C-alpha cells in the first residue's frame, strides 16, 4: 500500500513537471516581434499569439513626442501579421498607459498600465548606450523591460482572470536575464 501511494505521488509529480515545462515551451514558441527599430518591449498572452507592441513615438522632426512618448499597437499574428492601433476599450481599460513627465530637460517619464496602477515603469535614456529603455525597479535596482507575459485562466472576454504576469528583464550591469512574477 505504501509503495502504491508513493508510485502515485511520483507519477503525479512527473505529470506536473511535464506540463509546467510544456507551458514554458509554449511561451518560448511565441513569435518575437522584429523589424521595429523603436521597439521598447512587448506583451504576449497565453490565449493567442497576438502581441501588444510598445514603441518610442517620434514626431516629424525626429524628436521624442513629449505628449505621447510611447505608442502602442497590436501585431495580429493570428491573422495577417498586420499592425493596428489599440481600440478605445483596449487603450482605456487594458493596455493603454498613464504617462507622467519626470524631467522635461532629460525627457524622462514614469508610467503605469491603465489596468494595473500598482507598478510604475520608467522611460529613461541610458547614459551607457544613449538609447531609451523602459526600466522596472526591484529593491531599488533598475532593470530593462524586454517583454511581459500575461497568463490568463478563465474569466470572461470583458473581465479575464489574470493568474499572473511575468516581466522578463535584463540587468544592464551584467546583461543577465531576470524574471519578476507578479500575482495580481
Report the location of each language-model feature.
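Long, compositionally biased low-complexity segments enriched in polar/charged residues
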Residues: 42, 79-83, 88, 93, ...
